[in-house]
Amino acid sequence: MNDQTLDPAIHIQQLGTAARDAARGLVSASTEAKNKALMEAARALREATPALLEANARDVASVEGKKDEAFIDRLKLDEARVEGMASALEQIAELPDPVGRVLAQFDRPNGLRIERVAVPIGVIGMIYESRPNVGADASALCLKSGNAVILRGGSESRHSTREIVACMQAGLKAAGLPENAVQTVQTTDRNAVAELLKADEHVDLVIPRGGRGLVELVRDQASVPTLLHLDGNCHSYVHEAADVAKAVDVVRNAKLRRTGICGATESVVVDRVIAPALILALADAMAGDCELRGDETAVQLDDRITPASEDDWNTEYLGPIASVKVVDGLDEAIEWVEGHSSHHTDAILTEDAEAARRFMTAIDSAIVMHNASTQFADGGEFGMGAEIGIATGKMHARGPVGLEQLTSFKYLVHGSGQTRE
């Protein structure tokens, strides 16, 4: 298809109409049929590996010399990554079906029995950047939760995305489910994104997954409801009652296990009482692996720490850099974290249970941890299976967005002829 000949408004309307029809077909789909579709899609991915890698090579070639190595690495597929996508589909097939769960039930004095039951949201628009596997994961999660999905991946990954969608549609067809339950926007025209964001008639929810620029664009332009994931400016606060060795071990992992994920700690907040010992041990542990940028106190305590700028306190580095802030006690730490966190994930390191309770109550983030690495901010680590992202807002879903969060609910009211006076 020549995507440059497509009118974005008409194209999105056509995709939306087809997706809405498919969503109606998925509402009554059995768990067995959805699982079969996922297993068949996994098989199709494995069989299509040569074609998928060829398509991906075209995508990579189109950005070489224009994008940095980190971007190209996120875009690039190899046999191991394709196998990882296929395995992820099989794992999602093994998860419990979230649709049809009875969330609550109660009997009224007039004899009515009322049930609150989980149902699919309907049609989901997924807008993401360069990683092709996001399209596979999102498609699988939407399918298992009974939702149709319209994918709009980055233009750099368009050839890879089309191959992945073809495999998903093959799985749907094999299971007797609507093939249009998984579709991709076929044009690279950016106006298509704007059209998707205002397609209220056809799309029930839009989920962006990518950098701050993408998320802010969706937030500012969407009339469709959204699940937003802003950047992960995550904090690890070392309280005065922390075990220094334990705290340093946790903070090092929180920063360096994978620096490019949204759950990586970007800022270390340290109580003044414990700062001399903690900062020396932290600088030793990070030496050669991570640049530390600190406030005046931190710099005075260890000359391996360079002065931080005001921007450092609000920066998601996504690399081997961390800021270090020294505070006077728990109250100042709470005030500092609340003032600079992106409200994704924040942690306290302490052996004082009351201090931990106060911090975890006061910090208004989607995930708050005690004596654990912020890198555990992940749906898989929460036992939820795969995730479609981390929601940092407060409406509908918050934290890891897995199968359960991709459902809504409705009330089923059973009577025996009751009439209301």
UniProtKB/Swiss-Prot annotation:
Q: Which reaction does it catalyse?
A: L-glutamate 5-semialdehyde + phosphate + NADP(+) = L-glutamyl 5-phosphate + NADPH + H(+)
Molecular function terms from GO: glutamate-5-semialdehyde dehydrogenase activity; NADP binding
For the keyword Cytoplasm, the answer is yes
**Highest taxon of the source?**
Bacteria
Q: What family does this belong to?
A: Belongs to the gamma-glutamyl phosphate reductase family.
CDD domains linked to this entry: ALDH_F18-19_ProA-GPR
UniProt-listed Enzyme Commission number(s): 1.2.1.41
GO biological process terms held by the UniProt record: L-proline biosynthetic process
Tell me the route in metabolism or biology where this protein functions.
Amino-acid biosynthesis; L-proline biosynthesis; L-glutamate 5-semialdehyde from L-glutamate: step 2/2
Tell me what this protein is called.
Answer: Gamma-glutamyl phosphate reductase
Kindly list the places in or outside the cell where this protein is found, as annotated in its UniProt entry: Cytoplasm
What function is annotated for this protein? Catalyzes the NADPH-dependent reduction of L-glutamate 5-phosphate into L-glutamate 5-semialdehyde and phosphate. The product spontaneously undergoes cyclization to form 1-pyrroline-5-carboxylate.
Which EC class heads this enzyme's classification? oxidoreductase
Give a GO cellular-component term. Answer: cytoplasm
User: Per UniProt, what is one Pfam family of this protein?
Assistant: Aldedh
Keywords in alphabetical order: Amino-acid biosynthesis, Cytoplasm, NADP, Oxidoreductase, Proline biosynthesis
SUPFAM superfamilies xref list: ALDH-like
